[in-house]
């Protein structure tokens, strides 16, 4: 591979690094919202935790967990792409 293509791969990898940093920040935000919702659920009286309000809160927590998992998958995928690009440069 010539140096121009290697440089282009380096630029692409820098963009991927930026995406990974963004994903990390988003993961932190999702995790914080999830933790706040969990705290709110935990602080409800037991009778409310088992009622409709508690179910809605638990559904929200579960959805946030799924969102967090999706972001982790995206981050992992981007790291795999970087590995492949690094291999291509060799």
Language-model features, listed with the residues they occupy:
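Long, low-complexity or tandemly repetitive, helically biased scaffold regions used
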Residues: 2-90
């Amino acid at each position: 591979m010539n140096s121009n293509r290697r440089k282009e791969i380096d630029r692409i990898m820098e963009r991927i690094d930026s995406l990974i940093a963004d994903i990390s920040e988003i993961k932190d935000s999702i995790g914080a919202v999830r933790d706040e919702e969990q705290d709110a659920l935990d602080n409800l009286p037991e009778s409310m935790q088992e009622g409709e309000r508690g179910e809605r809160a638990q559904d929200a927590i579960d959805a946030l967990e799924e969102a967090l998992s999706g972001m982790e998958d995206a981050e992992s995928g981007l790291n795999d792409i970087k590995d492949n690009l690094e291999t291509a440069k060799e």
